[in-house]
Amino acid sequence: MGITRNLILGLACLAFVSIAKALPHEPELGSARVVFQTSYGDIEFGFYPTVAPKTVDHIFKLVRLGGYNTNHFFRVDKGFVAQVADVASGRSAPMNEEQRKEAEKKIVGEFSDVKHVRGTLSMGRYDDPNSAQSSFSMLLGNAPHLDRQYAVFGKVTKGDETLSKLEEVPTRREGIFVMPTERITILSTYYYDTKMESCEEERSVLKRRLQASFVEVERQRMKCFP
């Protein structure tokens, strides 16, 4: 009886371990966050620097250069993708030389086992696997047929309600693309570091504690040494 029970428990543990190994692990997000302020609301996203380091460096540099300001989502296919246009052709404002130089770079395809699910950020490209430049998609649903074919480099961290609003925009079909009938503009962008925010919060808490301690010391001093 005891042997049978132990055998069953052992098999159950092995099965659990096998399932755990089979389940995909979500990669760790870096501390950088980017916010796209669109005509339909804000979308915040983070990066997977250990999954697609070259892609992350390139996209984040374009953000820091202001490359995505005045760009737009040229494609919105409900339940599939909302795709940002290439910086070189999608902006309504002219580019400076530094922006243009970075936008025209081609990035090697960094394909991984990270799944294409809602909120995933995935690079656009042509047939050449190393032809990605600055266009990328925010997934609006699961798309397993894109797995290991397109480079995943991050995910949306806030603003899913904005993605839902984009899905309700009227669209028209042009060939394989489903495109919005109005321009969905990225009005402006900004970025911040979650580690720095955490440090600022800790400093603020410490400052309040020190101020409270000072008040208490002063109160005791006045009480004991009037």
Curated annotation (Swiss-Prot):
It catalyses: [protein]-peptidylproline (omega=180) = [protein]-peptidylproline (omega=0). Its EC number is 5.2.1.8. Residues 1-22 form the signal peptide. Keywords: Chaperone, Endoplasmic reticulum, Isomerase, Rotamase, Signal. GO terms for molecular function: peptidyl-prolyl cis-trans isomerase activity. Pfam families: Pro_isomerase. One of its GO terms (cellular component) is endosome. It is found in: Endoplasmic reticulum. Ubiquitous. Lower expression in roots. Residues 34-191 form the PPIase cyclophilin-type domain. It comes from the Eukaryota. The keyword Methyltransferase does not apply. Transmembrane segments: none annotated. Disulfide bonds: none annotated. InterPro entries: Cyclophilin-like_dom_sf (IPR029000), Cyclophilin-type_PPIase_dom (IPR002130), CYP23-like (IPR044233). PPIases accelerate the folding of proteins. It catalyzes the cis-trans isomerization of proline imidic peptide bonds in oligopeptides. Belongs to the cyclophilin-type PPIase family. This is Peptidyl-prolyl cis-trans isomerase CYP23. It comes from Arabidopsis thaliana (Mouse-ear cress). The lineage of its organism: Eukaryota, Viridiplantae, Streptophyta, Embryophyta, Tracheophyta.
